[in-house]
Structures are given as structure tokens and as C-alpha cells.
Design a protein with these regions (language model features):
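Surface-exposed receptor/substrate recognition regions of extracellular proteins
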Residues: 26
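Bacterial Sec-type N-terminal signal peptides, specifically the leucine/valine-rich hydrophobic h-region
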Residues: 17-20
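Short, low-structural-confidence N-terminal segments
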Residues: 4, 30-33
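A well-ordered secondary-structure block
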Residues: 104-204
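Short, well-ordered surface patches within globular domains
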Residues: 32-121
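Bacterial Sec-dependent N-terminal signal peptides
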Residues: 1-8
């Protein structure tokens, strides 16, 4: 179940994003790939993000989350990712080191101490809009703001690419059903992308 509770953007927030690409209209892609239903649109122009509740439900199932929050900061982070996205961020439709470096300035002013943020982006490549949106065995972007505590050093960002199965294990271990999740689609240079933003608060 998703709580449609939009949180105010804090001085430093957290989030993750997803992108989608195809020749068919987005509504048709949703109906074909996700088995019907609709999407909540938040803008259809190029570079604007359209929320996909179908994809969010798929991610909730993958991560084993019974309840998530759609926050303003997750939405705004996803929009920033979509705006800055470049096709060179993907190798074999997976995020690469160039994507990691480009995402750092987008996410680091949005992550607070003891929060973790994940982003994934993928293109829909086939003419009919189909894509294998399996998260296993693909690197996703991870930004953790580590606070060692008093007399143990300054807070720092720990940024790397990680398999989403690690995120699934952490969400299960820490019982983070209050995670913030936002997923949607955008267009860039004639292509459609799917993207996700996930935020976990208090990861240790």
C-alpha cells in the first residue's frame, strides 16, 4: 500500500529515480507491459516525469515493502535525474561509472545523515515498448550519508554502484516499511526511460 503523503522538501532530502523509452505512447506501454491500469501523470513534455503506479507496485513487491510514502523530495530528485540524464550513463542498459559521477551532485545535497538513497534508470528499447524490468544482476546507484558519531570523524557520503538484491536484504533486515519510493517515466532525445528513487531513513 502506498501512502500518498507528500513530505516537505527538507534542506537535505533523499531519493531515487527511474526512466523509460519506447516508440509507443506511454499509456499503451503501461497497458501492454504492466497488464492494464493507468498512470498518474505529472507532465507529459519531454524531460518531464510521469509517475507510474504500476512500476511502484512492482518495486514494492520486489523489495518486500507493504507500505511506502511518495514524497516531494523523491519526486523532485527523480525529476532532477531525468533533466540531467544522458544516454552515455548506460552500458547494456545498466548504469555505469559515468552515471555514478553525474548523479553525485544531484543527490548529495538531498541526503541527510543516516539516510540512504538509491537510483536506477533503464531504457525501453524494443519497438513495441517491451523491456525486461528485472532488477536482479544490474547495478544501481547508492548514496549513503554516514555519520560516524562524536569523536569518530566527520560525516561523509559513501557512493557506489550495487546490485538491488543488497537493497532488498537491507530493507528486510531493518524493517523499513516507511521507505520513500517514487517511480516513473520520462522522454529524452526521442526515447522513453523508466526510473526509480528509493530512500531509506536510519539505515543503521
Amino acid at each position: 500500500m502506498k501512502r500518498k503523503k507528500f513530505l516537505a522538501l527538507a534542506p537535505a532530502g533523499v531519493m531515487t529515480a527511474v526512466t523509460l523509452t519506447a516508440c509507443a505512447p506511454l499509456d499503451a506501454l503501461y497497458d501492454w507491459f504492466f497488464g492494464g491500469g493507468g498512470s498518474a501523470s505529472h507532465g507529459s513534455e519531454k524531460g518531464r516525469v510521469t509517475e507510474s503506479e504500476e512500476l511502484e507496485k512492482q518495486l514494492e513487491k520486489y523489495f518486500g515493502l507493504s507500505e511506502t510514502t511518495a514524497s516531494d523530495r523523491a519526486k523532485q530528485t527523480l525529476e532532477a535525474v531525468a533533466k540531467g540524464f544522458d544516454a552515455t550513463w548506460l552500458d547494456n542498459n545498466k548504469l555505469n561509472d559515468k552515471a555514478k559521477d553525474a548523479l553525485i551532485p544531484i543527490t548529495q545535497d538531498k541526503v541527510q545523515a543516516k539516510q540512504a538513497l538509491w537510483v536506477d534508470v533503464m531504457e525501453l528499447t524494443s519497438p513495441d515498448g517491451t523491456a525486461d524490468i528485472t532488477l536482479d544482476n544490474r547495478p544501481i546507484y547508492s548514496d549513503r550519508y554516514v555519520d560516524p558519531g562524536p569523536d569518530s570523524g566527520d560525516p561523509y557520503h559513501w557512493v557506489y554502484l550495487v546490485d538491488p538484491s543488497n537493497l532488498r536484504r537491507e530493507l528486510d533486515y531493518y524493517k523499513k516499511n516507511d521507505a520513500e519510493l517514487y517511480a516513473g517515466t520520462f522522454q529524452k532525445d526521442g526515447k522513453n526511460y523508466a526510473a526509480m528513487v528509493t530512500i531509506m531513513n536510519g539505515w543503521w
